[in-house]
Regions:
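Aromatic/acidic polysaccharide-binding cleft in carbohydrate-active enzymes
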Residues: 5, 60-92, 108-147
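Residues at the C-termini of beta-strands that transition into short coil/loop
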Residues: 15, 62, 218-221
Length: 232
């Protein structure tokens, strides 16, 4: 009711956050399995119920001052430490941090590639950790930022500005099953395709493709096209 003309023009898209983190972790908030098809269903529910302008301009987010840090959620244990004192002292192990950073990079790509307005909570791009408030509101780690993660966020922001299809392109689902997700953003002859694999094993996806070329805009490489199909 808030988006039908007499209340607000847009909302903080917490349902996107819930679905995105569940997909990246492979489990929902109630610990049941959660795959790409569940993420697609959640997003289609939003698309069906929101006016089109609201869906394509929603304030998409992964973290806020009211939520635990995404790196802690994506790299930490399924069950948080029991006491507030334990949560305040908690830090990811080196192995868990590597796992969490890999997921955060995927989360950032999903945030910047999906329809809506990508919003980053300060410090998430620098690799800050922390459970709930006030543990998630630490000072910015000046001089101790995760430079690789920062560069990843900056690159995604640059691509978003350079590619109109990522700003306002139509959403088209290409694949959504288990850990594998692929969708395209299309606008006036330009197509941007995002592909994700949250599993632990490499996988190959065969997607329909109509352009004569396919550039990997993140790495500068190319993907093979054979008989009108893109292999990633």
């Amino acid at each position: 009711k808030y988006l039908l003309g007499s209340e607000t023009h847009g909302l903080m898209n917490y349902p996107f956050r819930t679905a995105a983190l569940s997909y990246l972790l492979g489990r929902s908030e109630d610990a049941s399995p959660y795959g790409a098809e569940d993420f697609r269903e959640a997003m289609e529910t939003i698309r069906e119920n929101y006016p089109r302008p609201a869906f394509y301009s929603a304030m998409n987010l992964l973290g806020t001052h009211d939520t635990p840090r995404i790196l802690t959620l994506l790299g930490g244990p399924e069950t948080p430490p029991a006491t507030r004192r334990e949560r305040a002292a908690f830090r990811l192990s080196p192995e868990a941090r590597v796992r969490g950073l890999r997921r955060v990079r995927m989360a950032a790509l999903l945030l910047y590639a999906f329809p809506g307005s990508p919003t980053v909570f300060y410090g998430d791009e620098a690799g800050m950790e922390g459970w709930e408030d006030p543990m998630n509101r630490g000072t910015f780690p000046w001089g101790r930022e995760d430079r690789e993660l920062q560069a990843h966020f900056l690159r995604l922001g640059t691509l978003r500005r350079q590619r109109p299809s990522l700003q306002s392109g139509e959403l088209r689902w290409l694949y959504a099953e288990g850990p594998l997700l692929a969708f395209a953003r299309e606008l006036e002859g330009e197509t941007s395709t995002a592909v994700f694999n949250t599993g632990t094993s490499p996988a190959c996806l065969e997607l329909p493709w109509y352009a004569p070329f396919s550039d990997d805009v993140l790495t500068g490489g190319k993907f093979p096209i054979i008989d009108g199909k893109l292999f990633v």
